[in-house]
């Protein structure tokens, strides 16, 4: 094994924004100051509420410091279609998790996040 792997505990966050279909919103940011802080993998558990509508899911994110890759899975929702789609990006040394409301989704969107990080 080369070097060390750091597995960070659960980080819990919540918030809300005014959703507009197709408009991306950053819901979590992890700073990668240098190679020692490079985020390798993040596992997210997410929950979204919009009125009586809700969605829960997992997202697995990996990063090489330049690009971010994400895979949504375990997606559950109580509406005809999911409320949001999730993707990860890297900008200004930050790993961002973004939620994009799907067609027809507008208004106040609440979110709850739990994450585990491997650096």
Task: List each model region and its residues.
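Short, surface-exposed beta-strand/strand-loop-strand elements in extracellular ectodomains
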Residues: 54-63
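Low-complexity, small-hydrophobic/phenylalanine-enriched stretches
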Residues: 1-12, 44
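Surface-exposed ligand/attachment interfaces on beta-rich extracellular proteins
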Residues: 12-41, 49-53, 67, 102-106
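Residue-level recognition of well-ordered beta-strand positions that form the cores
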Residues: 6, 45-47, 60, 98-100, ...
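Beta-strand elements of well-folded, non-transmembrane domains
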Residues: 48-50, 63-65, 117
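Terminal beta-strand-rich extracellular "head" domains
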Residues: 62-81
């Amino acid at each position: 094994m080369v070097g060390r792997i750091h597995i960070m505990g659960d980080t819990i966050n919540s918030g809300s924004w005014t959703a507009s279909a197709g408009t991306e919103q950053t819901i979590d940011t992890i700073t990668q100051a240098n190679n020692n802080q490079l985020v390798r993998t993040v596992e997210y558990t997410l929950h979204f509420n919009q009125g009586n509508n809700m969605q829960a899911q997992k997202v697995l994110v990996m990063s090489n410091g330049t690009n971010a890759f994400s895979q949504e899975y375990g997606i559950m929702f109580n509406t005809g279609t999911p409320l949001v789609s999730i993707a990860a990006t890297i900008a200004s040394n930050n790993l961002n998790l973004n939620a994009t409301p799907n067609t027809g989704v507008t208004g106040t969107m609440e979110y709850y996040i739990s994450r585990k990080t491997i650096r």
